[in-house]
Amino acid sequence: MAVILDGKQVAHFLRQSLAEQVQTLAKEGKPIPHLAIVLVGDDPASHTYVYNKVKACQEVGFQTTFIQEASHVQESTLLYLIHKLNEDTSIHGIIIQLPLPKHINAIKIIQAITPSKDVDGLHTFNYGRMACNLPTHIPATPLGILLLLEHYQIETAGKHCVIIGRGPTVGAPLSILMSRNAYPGNATVTLCHSYTQQLTNFTRQADILVVAVGKPGLITADMIKPSTTVIDVGITRIPDTTKKRGYRLKGDVAFEEVATLCNAITPVPGGVGPMTIAALLTNTLRAATNQVYNTPTS
């Protein structure tokens, strides 16, 4: 049976450390990290994600400002809101819960955030610094994955890391991070996507397999080798009348069968999700203490 990479437990340890750092800041009379979260519309999944982020902030002692706009909000209104949040010196981090309604240009909205407050790490300024291996905000989910690999001391140097999914929030940035000259990193990376032919030929070569496509049960036991470390980023709501909430969460990996063969695996839920939030909090603390671009306060 595979080693379970318990993101929920590791995230708990990270939040404890963050809470201690916040207490130290308070004792020294320094600003407490303050995160602004903007939600547009009434998507149930987005509401759940935002609730979990606000709850985590409260647990570690961060201040939060939650702003919800109607799904028909004008793009110009959203841009003005971000402008005001940028100008507010008491706010250290800003996140826009994705996805946004189709009439709003998500890229334009993200680019409007001041890079030092872009704690989701999606601004092109931060993305470019990440690509150059310079200090910056790293996108939350890839950072969470790196922290998880580091906690479990998963060897990455010289390993073949196969990433399925080339999205801008997970697959694309993680491909850069896993090939950088650092730990975790120094891996040989293969990035697969919807046009990749004979996917199994690649997954069977993977020492580290990261799946982030949102297709439940895509990866089965016959697609991996026994020594593989599997990171399942996918999370899909499957209708289930036996559950009180009416659905269950399923990842991109057929967990039960793959876990009997692989070396290590993240569960869904309880794997990458909690680590993403822990990484977001980490970025926010760094923003509050001016450590984003390697300029810590004295």
Curated annotation (Swiss-Prot):
Q: What is the name of the protein in this document?
A: Bifunctional protein FolD
Q: Which reaction does it catalyse?
A: (6R)-5,10-methylene-5,6,7,8-tetrahydrofolate + NADP(+) = (6R)-5,10-methenyltetrahydrofolate + NADPH; (6R)-5,10-methenyltetrahydrofolate + H2O = (6R)-10-formyltetrahydrofolate + H(+)
InterPro entries in the cross-refs: Aminoacid_DH-like_N_sf, NAD(P)-bd_dom_sf, THF_DH/CycHdrlase, THF_DH/CycHdrlase_cat_dom, THF_DH/CycHdrlase_CS, THF_DH/CycHdrlase_NAD-bd_dom
Family under the similarity heading: Belongs to the tetrahydrofolate dehydrogenase/cyclohydrolase family.
PROSITE patterns for this protein: THF_DHG_CYH_2
- The EC number(s) this enzyme carries: 1.5.1.5, 3.5.4.9
One matching Pfam family: THF_DHG_CYH
Instruction: Please name the source species.
Output: Amoebophilus asiaticus (strain 5a2)
Keyword Membrane in annotation = no
Which positions bind NADP(+)?
165-167, 194, 235
> What is its pathway?
One-carbon metabolism; tetrahydrofolate interconversion
Q: How far does the signal peptide extend, from start to end residue?
A: none
Q: Does the keyword NADP apply?
A: yes
Q: Which gene underlies this protein?
A: folD
Q: Which UniProt keywords apply?
A: Amino-acid biosynthesis, Histidine biosynthesis, Hydrolase, Methionine biosynthesis, Multifunctional enzyme, NADP, One-carbon metabolism, Oxidoreductase, Purine biosynthesis
